């Protein structure tokens, strides 16, 4: 088995507030879709597994013949249907898990956007393999926000470690290595996008954090208000009204086994 996040944390994504706050997550750079377009093969259909609110799905529908967007959360899919472009006739929104949702293969590409670590690779990787068209691949997409040496960052990370129930966040490279070691994935290629500068207000940044499984109000429970208070105090001490970062996305592709 490859590493995965504690499954109980995934319940946060069933919460309407978490789903609403997903809109504050930093978007994928446009270069991600250029990479995915280059990976798509006949019949030019895509399975977007763990689609969430459609951050990948809606972009994929600009060039794929059909995108089957699968997510277990009704709240996420409701929010997805509110997004601009979500009514594209090429998109089919499907509630279910990647392990057991109905599929309509063959697919010219399977994508997972920051979602594969919530799945059981012993089930989904063989399932993806069976659903892929000849020559098609699985693409694992993730995003990293780079804050550099900003003075507030170290203090803020200490605060996150004090409140987050996750002691160690699994990086995508580590996850892919574990998949390879398990024999469930044959790596073929990797690309990273050029950094894209983004800026959010403090309110937007806090809303983005509240959309995560580890720092949502649902997860933090009675500690949520105290986390919010201490976080905003850090920004106030540093005279900050906004948060700047550079966003880099990585696309890793290969064949499931």
Regions found by a protein language model. Give the residues of each.
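A short acidic, Gly/Pro-enriched loop at the edge of an enzyme's catalytic core
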Residues: 102-110
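Short catalytic micro-motifs in class I SAM-dependent methyltransferases
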Residues: 114
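Conserved Class I S-adenosyl-L-methionine
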Residues: 177-257
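Conserved catalytic/acceptor-binding region of the Class I
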Residues: 129, 133-198
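A short, conserved alpha-helix within the catalytic core of class I
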Residues: 119-128
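Conserved class I S-adenosyl-L-methionine
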Residues: 1-42, 44-50
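Class I SAM-dependent methyltransferase SAM/SAH-binding core
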Residues: 53-100
């Amino acid at each position: 088995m490859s590493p995965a996040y504690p499954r109980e944390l995934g319940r946060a994504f069933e919460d309407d507030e978490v789903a609403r706050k997903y809109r504050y997550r930093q978007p994928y750079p446009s270069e991600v879709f250029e990479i995915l377009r280059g990976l798509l093969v006949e019949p030019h259909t895509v399975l977007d597994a763990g689609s969430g609110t459609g951050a990948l799905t809606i972009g994929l529908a600009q060039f794929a013949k059909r995108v089957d967007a699968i997510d277990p959360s009704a709240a996420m899919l409701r929010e997805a249907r509110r997004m601009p472009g979500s009514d594209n006739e090429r998109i089919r929104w499907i509630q279910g898990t990647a392990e057991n949702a109905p599929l309509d293969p063959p697919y010219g590409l399977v994508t997972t956007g920051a979602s594969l670590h919530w799945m059981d690779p012993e089930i989904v990787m063989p399932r993806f393999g069976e659903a892929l068209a000849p020559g098609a691949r699985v693409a694992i997409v993730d995003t990293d926000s780079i804050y550099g040496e900003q003075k507030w960052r170290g203090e803020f990370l200490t605060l996150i470690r004090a409140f987050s129930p996750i002691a160690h966040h699994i990086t995508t490279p580590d996850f892919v290595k574990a998949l390879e070691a398990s024999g469930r994935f044959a790596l073929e290629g990797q690309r990273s996008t050029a950094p894209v500068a983004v800026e959010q207000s403090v309110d937007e940044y806090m809303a983005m954090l509240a959309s995560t499984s580890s720092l949502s109000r649902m997860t933090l429970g009675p500690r949520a208000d105290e986390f919010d208070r201490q976080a905003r105090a850090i920004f106030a001490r540093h005279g900050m009204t906004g948060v700047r970062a550079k966003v880099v996305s990585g696309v890793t592709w290969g064949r499931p086994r």
